[in-house]
């Protein structure tokens, strides 16, 4: 856990937090969530672009995991379908790269510690920074 915190304390941390703060300050926010890859990446990308067009202030993008214990049955099902359809963490990163050509609002990843650790935490957080992810939610880390 300490290693993860250190990785997050790079020079871009303040920029990302300011971007999230600016998107949310002094107002109610529209923050939709989508599981990437359910039913496929192209549909996920199109849905995210529609969310932006319809006023999303920040979008949570779920990176699928095989045992999403913090989720209800609907999002659990979306995770299983996305994984069965061949989604990978790298495909999620690739989609974000494409979206960042058009979208400037904050993106936050929602995933599980196992996804981060199996990718390699240092590489995962470096890649998040590289592609323009503004925050990360790991519900299974206290």
Where would I find each of the regions flagged by the language model?
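Short, Lys/Arg-enriched N-terminal segments with co-localized hydrophobic residues
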Residues: 4-16
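N-terminal amphipathic alpha-helix/helix-capping segment at the start of soluble metabolic enzymes
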Residues: 15-33, 96-100
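Active-site mouth loops of central-metabolism enzymes
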Residues: 30-44, 108-120
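Conserved, mostly hydrophobic/aromatic
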Residues: 32, 51, 62, 128
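Glycine-rich, proline-tolerant flexible connector loops at the mouths of alpha/beta enzymes
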Residues: 39, 58-88
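Catalytic beta/alpha-barrel core
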Residues: 84-87, 132-142
């Amino acid at each position: 856990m300490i290693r993860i915190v250190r990785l997050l304390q790079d020079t871009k941390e303040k920029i990302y937090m300011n971007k999230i703060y600016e998107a949310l300050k002094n107002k109610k926010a529209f923050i939709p969530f989508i599981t990437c890859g359910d039913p496929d990446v192209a549909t996920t990308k199109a849905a995210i672009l529609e969310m932006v067009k319809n006023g999303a202030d920040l979008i949570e993008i779920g990176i699928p995991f095989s045992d999403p214990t913090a989720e209800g049955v609907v999002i659990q099902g979306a995770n299983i379908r996305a994984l069965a359809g061949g989604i990978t963490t790298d495909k999620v990163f690739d989609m974000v790269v494409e979206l960042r050509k058009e979208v400037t609002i904050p993106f936050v990843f929602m995933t599980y510690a196992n996804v981060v650790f199996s990718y390699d935490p240092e590489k995962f957080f470096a890649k998040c920074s590289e592609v323009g992810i503004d925050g990360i939610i790991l519900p299974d880390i206290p």
